[in-house]
A protein has these predicted regions:
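N-terminal glycine-rich, Lys/His-bearing helix-loop that initiates the first secondary-structure elements
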Residues: 1-66, 464, 468-471, 500-502, ...
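Conserved PLP-enzyme active-site core in the AAT-like
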Residues: 18, 28-31, 37, 82, ...
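A short linear hydrophobic-aromatic micro-motif
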Residues: 102-104, 246, 374-378, 497-498
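Conserved small-domain helix->loop->beta segment predominantly found in fold-type I
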Residues: 308-386, 391, 412-432
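PLP-dependent enzyme catalytic core of the Aspartate aminotransferase-like
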Residues: 368, 372, 379-515
Length: 515
C-alpha cells in the first residue's frame, strides 16, 4: 500500500522545505552555544558548574565536558526569557514546520503529551471517546483528569495479534452510540500511525469528530517525520486534527524523552489553547532540560531541510522489504494492510516482518538477534518483528537480513520451534467490560490476588504489554481469563515486560475489594 498525501485543510501553511531559509535556523541551540562560549563563574544550578572539576570529573569523563557546558538552567536572558526569546522563535519554527498553530516542546516524552491532552480536554467536558488501543499514558491521563471514557475498537489483524486504527465510519457509529447512551463525547482520541505503521484517515476522522461537536486528538507519537518528504504521509496538524502528540525522538532525531505537542487549526483551538497551556505548566518540570529542548530545535531543522536524506532512508527500507518478500522464510505485514478499511497509508520507515513462516516466535528471534548479532529491533509479537529506520538513517539492512536468515536456520531455532509447537502463544485478548470509572477503581480499597483468582474481578491498575504499551487492562475493567493468559505469556517471553504489573511474572493482580 503506497503512502498518500491528502490535501491540507484550508488556511494551513504548506510543509516547510529546505528552500525556506528560516528552517535552516536553530535559535535555541545557537543561544546555548553562545552562552557556553562565554567566560563564566557559575554560582547557580546545576551543581556540576558546566565543567569536569570536583565531583563532576567522572561525569565529564563519561559524557564529555561539552554536554555539561550546554546544560544550563531555565529562565536565562537571551535564551528562554522574553516574548521574542530564542526559545519562542524555535517554537514558532516548529509550529510552522509541522503545520500547527502553536507548538510546545516537551521533555517528558509523548507520555507527557498524552497526559496534557487528557487534562486539557477535561476543560471541555468529562466524556472522552478513545481508541481502545491508546497508549497507557493516555489512560493515566484519563484517570488523573477524572475523565469518563467510552471506547471505539480498532481493527484487529487476528493472524498477528496487531491492533491498527479506526475508520471514520467506525468513529461515527461509536460517537452516535455514546450520545444515545447519554454520554456524548466532549473529545475524541485516536492513534495514527499505529505501532506497525498503519496510517488512519485523519482528515476524515476530524470531519466526523467535529460534526459531533468534539475536537480530535491524534496520538501521532510514531509519526514525527510525517510531512517532510513527498513519500511520507502528511502531518496530522495539516489534516484537521485539533491536538497532535508527537514523539520527536522516536524517528525524528531528537534525544530520548523529548517530544512536541502541536495545536492544530480546527474549530476548537481557541478553547483548547489556554487549557493546554495550563496543563503544560502543571506537568512540566520546573528544571526543564536545555539539552533536550536544543535537540528538538535541531531535529526540526534537520527534518525540514533533510528531504534528500529522508528519501535515502525510504529507498533503503523499500529495498529491505523487497528482500524479505523474496525470502520464503519471511513476509511483510503491510502487504496485507489493504484488507483493513481504516488504513489509508503506510509509514515507509517502519518495516513489520512476518516471521510465522519461519516457525519461530518473534519474541525469541528479537532476543536472539540482540544477544548474538547486536541487532536491536523495536518490538516483537508472537509472529512478527518491527524494524524502525530513523529519518535520514541508512543502517546496514542487508546485514540485518542475513542475521535474520541465519537465526531462523540455526539449531537453536529448531529447538525453539518444538517448544512453540507444544505451547503456542495466546491471542491478543478483547478488553473486558468497564464496570466502574478508572478513577474510582484506582482509588478504591484494593487487594492483591493470585492470577487465577483475578478472573471476573475489577482491575485497579493499568497493565500494558511493552512494547508497544497499549493497555490490555485499565482500572475499572473486568479481568478476563484471556487477558490473564496473554499478560502472563508476555511476561514469560524473552524481553517481555508488563508495565503496571504487581510483580514481574504477573502472578498477582491488584483488584478492587468485594463488598
Amino acid at each position: 500500500m503506497a503512502s498518500t498525501r491528502p490535501s491540507p485543510v484550508d488556511g494551513v501553511r504548506p510543509p516547510a522545505t529546505a528552500d525556506d531559509l528560516r528552517q535552516w535556523e536553530t535559535p535555541y541551540a545557537d543561544a546555548l552555544d553562545r552562552h557556553a562560549a562565554r567566560e563564566q563563574i557559575p554560582l547557580m544550578v546545576p551543581g556540576h558548574g558546566g565543567d569536569g572539576l570536583g565531583l563532576s570529573a567522572r561525569l565529564a569523563e563519561f559524557i564529555g565536558e561539552r554536554p555539561l557546558q550546554l546544560d544550563v538552567p531555565m529562565l536565562m536572558d537571551d535564551i528562554d526569557l522574553g516574548e521574542d526569546s530564542p526559545l519562542s522563535r524555535s517554537l514558532d519554527l516548529a509550529a510552522e514546520a509541522w503545520g500547527a498553530r502553536r507548538t510546545w516542546f516537551l521533555t517528558g516524552g509523548a507520555s507527557q503529551g498524552n497526559r496534557i491532552a487528557a487534562l486539557a480536554v477535561r476543560g471541555l467536558g468529562a466524556n472522552v471517546l478513545s481508541q481502545r488501543s491508546a497508549h497507557s499514558s493516555f489512560s493515566d491521563g484519563v484517570l488523573s483528569a477524572g475523565l469518563v471514557p467510552s471506547f471505539v475498537l480498532p481493527s484487529i489483524d487476528t493472524d498477528h495479534g496487531v491492533a491498527h486504527g479506526v475508520s471514520p465510519a467506525a468513529l461515527d457509529d461509536a460517537l452516535a452510540a455514546a450520545a444515545a447512551d447519554g454520554r456524548a463525547a466532549d473529545a475524541v482520541y485516536i492513534v495514527s500511525p499505529s505501532y506497525f505503521g498503519a496510517v488512519a484517515d485523519v482528515a476524515g476522522l476530524a470531519r466526523v469528530a467535529h460534526a459531533h461537536g468534539a475536537p480530535l486528538i491524534v496520538d501521532g507519537a510514531w509519526g514525527p517525520h510525517f510531512g517532510f518528504h513527498p513519500d511520507l504521509p502528511e502531518s496530522p496538524a495539516r489534516l484537521g486534527a485539533d491536538l497532535v502528540v508527537s514523539s520527536t525522538h522516536k524517528l525524528g532525531g531528537s534525544l530520548t524523552q523529548s517530544a512536541m505537542l502541536h495545536l492544530g487549526h480546527g474549530p476548537f483551538v481557541d478553547a483548547l489553547e489556554p487549557l493546554v497551556e495550563r496543563a503544560v505548566s502543571i506537568t512540566a518540570s520546573t528544571s526543564t532540560s536545555a539539552l533536550l529542548q536544543a535537540s528538538l530545535d535541531i531535529a526540526r531543522h534537520s527534518l525540514a531541510t533533510g528531504a534528500e536524506l529522508i528519501g535515502r532512508s525510504i529507498v533503503a527500507a523499500d529495498a529491505f522489504r523487497d528482500a524479505l518478500r523474496d525470502d520464503p522464510r519471511f513476509g511483510v505485514l503491510s502487504d496485507g494492510f489493504g484488507a483493513f478499511d481504516d488504513i489509508v497509508a503506510v509509514d515507509p520507515l517502519r518495516v513489520a516482518i512476518d516471521v510465522s513462516s519461519a516457525g519461530v516466535s518473534g519474541h525469541w528471534l528479537r532476543q536472539r538477534l540482540a544477544d548474538t548479532d547486536g541487532i536491536f529491533f523495536e518490538m516483537s509479537t508472537a509472529t512478527s518483528l518491527v524494524a524502525l529506520i530513523g529519518a535520514g538513517k541508512t543502517p546496514d539492512l542487508q546485514r540485518a537480513h542475513r542475521a535474520l536468515a541465519a537465526a531462523v536456520d540455526s539449531e537453536e531455532a529448531q529447538t525453539h520451534r518444538s517448544r512453540v509447537a507444544d505451547h503456542g502463544f495466546p491471542a491478543l485478548p478483547d478488553p473486558g467490560a468497564l464496570q466502574m470509572s478508572p478513577r474510582d477503581a484506582f482509588f478504591a480499597d484494593t487487594e492483591l490476588v493470585p492470577a487465577a483468582d483475578a478472573v471476573g474481578r475489577i482491575s485497579a491498575d493499568t497493565l500494558a504489554a511493552y512494547p508497544p504499551g497499549i493497555p490490555n487492562l485499565i482500572p475499572g475493567e473486568e479481568i478476563t481469563a484471556q487477558t490473564v493468559a496473554f499478560l502472563r505469556a508476555v511476561a514469560g517471553s524473552p524481553s517481555g515486560y508488563v508495565r503496571g504489573a504487581a510483580d514481574p511474572g504477573v502472578e498477582q493482580f491488584r483488584v478492587t475489594r468485594l463488598g
